[in-house]
Regions:
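Loop/turn elements at helix/coil->beta-strand transitions in domains of secreted/extracellular proteins
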Residues: 4-9, 36-44, 71-75, 98-101, ...
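Short beta-strand elements in bilobed, periplasmic/extracellular small-molecule ligand-binding domains
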Residues: 8-11, 30-56, 155
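Cofactor-binding loop segments of dinucleotide-utilizing enzymes, especially the Rossmann-like FAD-
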Residues: 14, 105-107, 161
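Hydrophobic alpha-helical
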Residues: 29, 44-46, 50-112
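Hinge/cleft segment of the Venus flytrap/periplasmic-binding protein
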Residues: 36, 127-173
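Beta-alpha-beta core module
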Residues: 110-120
Length: 173
């Protein structure tokens, strides 16, 4: 948050990534930001869901955002891998690295390299091993009982410059 004044935060997702989980992340971040703000600080949260039904819709939306006359937000929170990679490329293309803080999603090579180079601040990644375990548990439950009605909450990890190496394959290290 800025020391004084308003900090604008934009959550950016695509129609294919807009899920209950993205709504949960949005509400948790909003709650956390509201609890951390001090006197004289305010937070302006916006959420955009890009219609990604056609090829390059996400790329076009992100490009339009960077070339429009409207000011860019202080922080962009990307809610899927495609948005993260599009925003990374736009930051470089439009010379905005350092002007906009970006929190990416997932850990592709592009995202990890962008974190290492300081293009984006960090990324959020779901614990894939845990997803696999829970999937097997749900499948076992379905086979045994004919249904599975549990909700499995999966851990999220924050990837920063300090730990990108942990998310690379052996060949990439």
């Amino acid at each position: 948050l800025k020391d004084k004044g308003s900090t604008s935060v934009m959550f950016l997702s695509t129609s294919s990534s807009k899920t209950q989980e993205t709504n949960l992340v949005y509400s948790q971040v909003k709650k956390e930001l509201e609890s951390r703000k001090k006197t004289g600080q305010s937070v302006d949260l916006t959420e955009y869901c890009v219609d990604s039904s056609a090829d390059f819709d996400t790329e076009e939306f992100v490009r339009d955002m960077f070339v429009s006359d409207e000011s860019l937000p202080d922080v962009i929170v990307c809610m899927d891998e495609v948005v993260t990679e599009c925003v990374c490329q736009a930051l470089v293309d439009y010379n905005q690295v350092g002007n906009v803080k970006v929190i990416g999603y997932y850990y592709s090579n592009v995202t990890l390299n962008a974190i290492d180079k300081g293009i984006i601040s960090s990324a959020i990644a779901l614990d894939m091993e845990e997803i696999g375990r829970y999937s097997i548990n749900a499948l076992d439950e379905y086979i045994s009982f004919g249904h599975s009605n549990n909700y499995y909450s999966v851990d999220q990890h924050v990837i920063t410059k300090d730990n990108t190496r942990e998310y690379r394959t052996e060949d990439e290290k």
